[in-house]
Amino acid sequence: MSDAETNAWDAIHRVEKRTLLELFDADSERVSKLSHRLAWGVESPGGQEAGGILFDWSKTHLTDELLDGFEALADAMDFAGAREKLLSGAKINVTEGRAAEHTAQRGTGAEASVEEAVALMGRMKALVDAIHGGAMGEVKHLIHVGIGGSALGPKLALDALTRDLALVDVHVVSNIDGVALEQAFAACDPATTLIAIASKTFTTIETMTNATSALHWLKTNGVDDPHGRVVALTANPEAAVEFGVDETRVLPFMESVGGRYSLWSSIGFPVALGAGWDEFEGMLAGAQAMDEHFASADGRANLPLLAAFADLYYTRVRGCQARACFAYDERLGLLPDYLQQLEMESNGKRVKADGTPVDGPTAPITWGGVGTDAQHAVFQLLHQGTHLVPVDFIASIAPGDDLDPAHHRILLTNCFAQGAALMAGGNMAADEKDPARVFPGDRPSATMLCDDLDAVTLGALIAFHEHRTFANAVLMGINPFDQFGVELGKKMAKDIESGGAEFDASTQALVGAAGLA
């Protein structure tokens, strides 16, 4: 750790710990200092000017003194230099020797990379338009097989953007468990179904096994040329062609786009096909708007960086091992899962980018749920448990339904009430000596309040969390773009399948009990 980094952390640790209520009492401008609204200068797919998001960190323990310390830490870790490397296409993924160019897919990056991304997007749009125009016959269903970032991002976007009837009914299948694929088959007519195979390498065992079974399903149900119903989304187009996919239906994406950051590439094909090209393009526009903010704002004015300051304060100063996200919007039901992969796969590391051990705790356990469902399941622990868990609340001012406005009013009042209750605490006992009804309070939360959950806002929201994850990584000295932690278990699974390796007695017994020996 450099002297500048040590000095910054020393300053952060010296800041007096005060309760949230004390912080509000001490500063009448606290809300205005720690609440920031970002609005987009772009139109939503519906033609109206898109709105924005209000970010509120006033219910966290951040103070001017803490922010001064974290800004010094950002300088010590050369955050500005790391940001420039990310956005200019430098090889910032040092362990794998390549760039991380997901922002280039939406127009922010090295000129040559942006031009390549635009060309690839044009190719995808042409295919989407052709399918919608009947070039592949009647298409009512798409079975999209992928795993990890190749599946979770598209499914999140489709859930958020296809409340109205989808242009094409999309079923995203990621699990190797055959039940998942059979459920998709049951909902689709083989004669009007396409298969999308999403795999960066086109070798991922779960995806390729599911793809082979999907082709077999088409063949055994009267489709003479099942490969003629396949679209491939990959950074290895040669492998897709070798698999039997016609080159005109192979949609490549750049090798420098990581899986969990790949929604913006051809991996977004099912979103464009199911929700419409305008919706997909709206997501790109919203993400680019967030890119522009991230690229230009400095210090605490940079909202993804400000979020990272709060994250690091709770993990490294307050010792929090988890952070929760609760979406008070049914359309964002998969957002906690998406963030779980984004943050834990990116920053769940024990060594820094230079190979030395990390200096403290890294990514917390990211978890969460949906709205009032979660209140009746896990909020007991948040309010009265022994774990201090910072919470992010996400909601939309505009409802996503056409029902009685009472539905949405109750939803929002619950969202805001939970943040207030976590902070203030209270005593609900008729007898004040009953400790079981005491709420200690001083539990931190942040709120992200969207004007509306349209495609532009969704893109901005996802990009915000990407940049937040990157900012955390820079401040910890981590490379967030590799994921070697997923490899060992995959290798051992192959060894069990081949029967060519000895394992511990417990694993051997399980293999035998399952009849796999």
UniProtKB/Swiss-Prot annotation:
Broad class of where this protein is predominantly found: cytoplasm
EC number(s) recorded for this UniProt protein: 5.3.1.9
Catalytic site: 345 (proton donor), 376, 490
Sample GO molecular function, one term: carbohydrate derivative binding
UniProt entry tagged with the keyword Protein biosynthesis: no
Record's catalysed reaction(s): alpha-D-glucose 6-phosphate = beta-D-fructose 6-phosphate
Homology family: Belongs to the GPI family.
Function: Catalyzes the reversible isomerization of glucose-6-phosphate to fructose-6-phosphate.
Protein name per Swiss-Prot or TrEMBL: Glucose-6-phosphate isomerase
Organism: Erythrobacter litoralis (strain HTCC2594)
